[in-house]
């Protein structure tokens, strides 16, 4: 009878453990869906910084300490916050209340259940090798793990490589290496700099057209020096 009781207790303990694991897996699965709100500004890939810093391997780490990300606020860098369940719950709920003056433009998640599920996912995704595991398990697509990276313009055709760009009155006038010429209204052009390996080669500018009728464009330079050198005010 005593042996049966021990066996029954062990079985009940095993069943309880399996139930907890199933509950945790379900939370992670739901959290993966909620992660879309984070993926709009962050990457899970190491060293890939977008609007916000990479989240790779940040579980249990101090906030504001990624050396090659320079856009932290002083308040966050001095906060001493360690990223784990309770701190992430407060941050995701009301980032402005937790760190006044933060530049993270995110209104927060009011639903405590959604936050709980999201944090369960982040615990897995923000650990070492988390992005690869989350993609491999089918919880998120690779594109979500990478985040919304800008177009790779390190190698483009003559139809995008800019031969001349000048500003005159209310317009930008772009001539590409294939000889095509495009006049754009000045407010429809975004001047960008991409210093990453995915950006233009030094001394080059790249045209990226957009808009429903192609009337909008980004002009991407590799540095501010190239902007000053290649962009002229000339009519």
Label each region the model flagged:
Residues 17-34:
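Electrostatic cytochrome c docking/interface patches
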Residues 150-169:
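Structural detector for short beta-strands of small beta-barrel domains
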Residues 136-156:
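Short boundary/loop segments of OB/S1/cold-shock single-stranded nucleic-acid-binding domains
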Residues 31-45, 118-122:
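The canonical Cys-X-X-Cys-His
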Residues 200-218:
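Flexible glycine-rich surface loops and low-complexity tracts that mediate binding to linear polymers
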Residues 212-235:
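OB-fold/S1-family single-stranded nucleic acid-binding modules
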Residues 30, 43-83, 165-166, 175-192:
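Gly/Gly-Pro-rich "capping" loops immediately C-terminal to redox-active cysteine motifs
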